[in-house]
Design a protein with these regions (language model features):
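Positions in alpha-helical segments
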Residues: 12-15, 101-104, 115, 145-149, ...
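A structural connector/turn signal
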Residues: 67-68, 137, 149
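Alpha-helical coiled-coil heptad-repeat register
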Residues: 168-171, 175-178, 182, 189
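A short beta-sheet element
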Residues: 69-71, 78-131, 135, 143-144
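Sequence-specific dsDNA recognition surfaces
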Residues: 9-13, 30-75
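Non-catalytic DNA-recognition/assembly elements of restriction-modification systems
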Residues: 8-40, 149, 153, 157, ...
């Protein structure tokens, strides 16, 4: 699949990003999606690391009971699993709830599309850099300082929405093909 190039590019100032379209901005994550620290007052829609599928951010139901305080999140927030960040557990919240355990919860500003930001954070380069900054050997964790300092490419909001919608559509098509292949494999057994 080939896509047309943008007419003009500029250096992003970030080695792993390379060039970006001329009209895009590059800003640190902490300025486009600040950290949420609001503690949950009641247990409502708890989400733990085990509820997030690696590399997709899909919410997985479990019967687990969760203890301890959580961070309140809203629809549109992003939950970044800070424990073992190489697992890429990054969830875009489609409803409000409580992040239980090792999460950095960030809230995109008004000029940032949360789905676009989630896709951007799920880039292999992004995850590898964050993973290289972890502390702790048995249970490596990503700090907010490292995550918040990450450069984030930002096209204008309408373009962010179009890119996120395109990626969501294409990912859904791939999911259908994978499910069909799994069904065919089961038939062959």
């Amino acid at each position: 699949m080939s896509f047309p190039r943008y007419p003009e590019y500029k250096p992003s100032g970030v080695e792993w990003l390379g060039e970006v379209p001329e009209h895009w901005e590059v800003n640190r994550l902490k300025y486009v999606a600040p950290l949420v620290t609001e503690r949950a007052e009641t247990r409502s829609n708890p989400v733990a690391l085990e509820n997030i599928e690696s590399w997709t951010g899909t919410l997985l139901p479990t019967d687990s009971q969760f203890e301890g305080e959580g961070t309140q999140f809203r629809t549109g927030d992003i939950l970044f699993g800070k424990l073992r960040p190489y697992l890429a557990k990054i969830h875009f919240a489609t409803r409000a709830g409580e992040a239980v355990g090792d999460f950095h919860v960030v809230r995109p500003t008004a000029d940032v599309d949360g789905r676009f930001l989630q896709h951007s954070m799920l880039r292999r380069e992004f995850i590898d850099i964050i993973d290289g900054t972890t502390f702790g050997s048995k249970m490596p964790r990503a700090s907010w300082e490292a995550l918040g300092a990450m450069p984030t490419p930002l096209p204008p909001l309408p373009e962010q929405r179009a890119i996120a919608a395109f990626l969501d559509r294409e990912t859904a098509k791939i999911d259908v093909l994978v499910a069909e292949q799994q069904r065919l494999i089961e038939l062959l057994k």
